[in-house]
């Protein structure tokens, strides 16, 4: 699986066990992701942070 880094022009290949790509947004500003990468399980959203997870190459 390949996931985009913070700047979508760059990406990385996920290590074994990390089978999801994610992007994280601040709830107050959903237009600009603050973090992207590989993850093993999608975190729960909170009052401040929203996560979007997916499982295809460079989907984040």
Swiss-Prot record:
InterPro entries, A to Z: Cytotoxin_Cobra (IPR003572), Snake_3FTx (IPR003571), Snake_toxin-like_sf (IPR045860), Snake_toxin_con_site (IPR018354), Toxin_cobra-type (IPR054131)
Protein source organism: Naja kaouthia (Monocled cobra)
Main subcellular localisation: secreted
Function text: Heterodimer: has no cytolytic activity, but retains most of the alpha-cobratoxin capacity to compete with alpha-bungarotoxin for binding to Torpedo and alpha-7/CHRNA7 nicotinic acetylcholine receptors (nAChRs) as well as to Lymnea stagnalis acetylcholine-binding protein.
Name this polypeptide is given: Cytotoxin 3
Keywords from the named record: Cardiotoxin, Cytolysis, Disulfide bond, Glycoprotein, Membrane, Secreted, Target cell membrane, Target membrane, Toxin
Localization in the cell: Secreted; Target cell membrane
Keyword Endoplasmic reticulum: no
UniProt tissue specificity: Expressed by the venom gland.
Domain of life: Eukaryota
